[in-house]
Amino acid sequence: MVKNLTHHPVVIYKNGSVFLIIEPEGPVPRCKEERVQIGEIDGIPFTNTRFGIVQDLPEKKEGVFLIVSPIVANALPKRDDLLVPDDLVRDDQGNIIGCRALARVSWWGCEKFSW
């Protein structure tokens, strides 16, 4: 079972057509944010934003996957039940209208390399 814990319907495309629409349900998990203005660039505030603990995320349940924002998924890399829209589909103006897959978030390439 997949639950959508974002504000927007998640539209899944398959073979160029809408395959499934997963409507939002339940509270939307968010990371606590802290912003500190550290200056201005051309009159635009320049801030340092830190993301903290995740709020409003249900406990993990066997067989249940949760679609969440990439920030939430990144904050909890050990939660293998968290998914994000992947392989995005865009309209002619470049707006995101759906995705072709759901993905777990993982990091690579952040290690220190010796050339």
Spans of features found by a protein language model:
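Hydrophobic/aromatic-rich, well-ordered segments within soluble, folded domains that form packed cores
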Residues: 1-13
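Intrinsically disordered, low-complexity segments enriched in small/polar residues
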Residues: 7-8, 16-115
